[in-house]
A protein has these predicted regions:
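Active-site/catalytic core of tyrosine-dependent DNA strand-transfer enzymes
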Residues: 108-152
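Basic, Lys/Arg- and aromatic-enriched nucleic-acid-binding interface segment
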Residues: 22, 26-72, 76
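DNA breakage-rejoining catalytic core of tyrosine-based enzymes
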Residues: 17-22, 31-49, 97-109, 120-124
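C-terminal catalytic core of tyrosine-transesterase DNA break-rejoin enzymes
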Residues: 16, 62, 66, 73, ...
Length: 198
């Protein structure tokens, strides 16, 4: 699908400058399979290992777990301007998250310890206005996974979000509080995060 998207972009540009037809028309996207993200049982140990491996991956994992943001876009694209002045909250506009609604997310103190506020327009990982490339954390996670002996089959960077969701449900016992914290439009979506609950 990624190659199809890139080729389509090139063909669309070629059509703008005079190409007469779109050879990508009629080619369907490959359907992707849903992925089960297995939650972590030993979250502290995994987080410590990630911290020793790479500071950016560690911060991404912490924010994914503690703030329940999606790692590959919502976390990767964070700027210092998305944080409140005291770093206690993250403000995400609707065009920056999957639900399409504005979200205000509390930042736990154990995450604030790793944050040093920078220029409001700068990305928290790159230190520049541009975020890191969209495969940055995917690639970093693959490299970490290869050298780690702690991870189980099905545990991904996204598993930190699932583990955080389970932790919230254990603490509150409320599916509606979990739904609100996750930014889901439906309780049914939030329930899928609890399938790893034991």
């Amino acid at each position: 699908n990624t190659y199809r998207m890139r080729i389509s972009t090139l063909i669309n540009e070629a059509i703008k400058v005079g190409m007469s037809s779109n050879s990508m028309e009629g080619i369907k996207s490959k359907r992707t399979k849903a992925n089960l993200h297995k939650p972590y049982k030993n979250i502290g140990l995994i987080i410590d290992n990630v911290r020793a491996y790479n500071a950016n991956l560690h911060l991404c994992a912490l924010i994914t777990y503690g703030c329940l943001l999606r790692p590959h876009r919502e976390v990767r694209e964070l700027t210092w301007g998305d944080f409140s002045d005291d770093l206690s909250y993250i403000h995400l506009s609707g065009n920056r998250n999957k639900s399409g609604r504005n979200r205000i997310v509390p930042v736990p103190s154990y995450i604030k310890d790793f944050l040093v506020k920078g220029n409001p327009k700068d990305n928290i990982f790159s230190g520049k206005p541009q975020p890191l490339n969209q495969d940055y954390f995917k690639t970093l996670w693959s490299r970490f996974k290869r050298q780690s002996n702690l991870l189980e089959q099905g545990q991904t960077l996204y598993s930190f979000r699932h583990s955080g969701a389970i932790e919230i449900f254990k603490r509150t016992g409320s599916i509606t509080k979990l739904q609100k914290a996750m930014g889901h439009s439906s309780i049914n979506v939030s329930l899928t995060y609890l399938r790893g609950l034991e």
